[in-house]
């Protein structure tokens, strides 16, 4: 496939390619990423082993390759918006990853991010040099493929349109078509079972976090008399001062003022 060839070329010349695969939910973004990884690694299990929902697992792989003085041909950050969403750009872990992304080439030759829309951090998305839009094979595309001697079932195949993104000397975006890939939605059953289990675990974890957050908001709304304690509890749970202000329904200045007061009292 076109994208696989670009990744191989990048690896050989010690370059770096970053890819944003986007499209509606369930259209086949992960299927495309896995097919690309399979072409790169030649093994479905190895391909899946290089797909990550959890950033910690991906960072652990980077550290292992760095210790060995090697570079990873390809990793996949699936549903990257779960932890790299622009809606929470101020969190420290996201800022740290963006800074690491500037030097990622030392340990990684290419990375694919999948997301339903362009909801990644702006600083990160501006540095991604390939965009891939996943689309259904409609009547017009089907006829085009037939003219090129390609016959596929539109129900089980998708088209991945590849665009190169760069900036002009005036920092204006330049979009250039690089080609397209036609690929099947399906892959081996045992790989799908493994992937589905990983995804269910991630969904379960996310639901627990949402439930905990909702319960916290209910408790906060029911009792604002002990607001200093609530601020400290949320701070210990890893929430930023801006997030605490939103959760408690108070201004950021109030959060800073109360924390400063608590600090003075403890001295």
Residue ranges, per PLM feature:
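The conserved Walker
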Residues: 24-25, 89
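Pre-Walker A adenine-sensing motif
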Residues: 1-13
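Short alpha-helical "recognition helix" segments of helix-turn-helix
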Residues: 243-248
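Short coil turns linking two alpha-helices in DNA-binding domains
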Residues: 240, 251-253
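Short, amphipathic alpha-helical "recognition" segments used to contact nucleic acids or chromatin
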Residues: 221-239, 266
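Conserved nucleotide-sensing/catalytic segment adjacent to the nucleotide-binding pocket
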Residues: 55-110
């Amino acid at each position: 496939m076109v994208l696989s060839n670009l990744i191989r070329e990048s690896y050989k010349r010690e370059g770096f390619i970053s890819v944003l695969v986007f499209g509606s939910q369930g259209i086949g973004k992960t299927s495309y990423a896995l097919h690309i990884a399979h072409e790169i690694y030649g093994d479905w299990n190895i391909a899946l082993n290089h797909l990550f929902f959890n950033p910690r697992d991906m960072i652990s792989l980077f550290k292992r390759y760095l210790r060995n003085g090697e570079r990873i041909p390809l990793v996949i950050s699936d549903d990257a918006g779960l932890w790299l969403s622009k809606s929470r750009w101020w969190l420290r872990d996201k800022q740290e990853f963006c800074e690491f992304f500037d030097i990622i080439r030392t340990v990684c030759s290419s990375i694919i991010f999948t997301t339903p829309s362009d909801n990644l951090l702006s600083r990160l998305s501006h540095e991604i040099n390939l965009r891939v839009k996943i689309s259904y094979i409609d009547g017009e595309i089907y006829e085009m493929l037939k003219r090129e001697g390609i016959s596929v079932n539109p129900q089980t195949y998708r088209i991945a349109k590849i665009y190169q993104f760069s900036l002009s000397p005036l920092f204006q975006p330049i979009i250039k078509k690089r080609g397209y890939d036609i690929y099947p939605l399906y892959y081996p059953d045992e790989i799908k079972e493994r992937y589905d289990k990983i995804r269910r675990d991630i969904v379960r974890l996310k639901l627990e976090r949402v439930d905990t957050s909702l319960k916290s908001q209910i408790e906060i709304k029911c009792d604002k008399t002990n607001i200093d304690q609530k601020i400290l509890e949320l701070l210990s749970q890893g929430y930023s001062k801006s997030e605490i202000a939103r959760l408690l329904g108070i201004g950021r200045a109030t959060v800073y003022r109360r924390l400063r007061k608590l600090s003075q009292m403890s001295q």
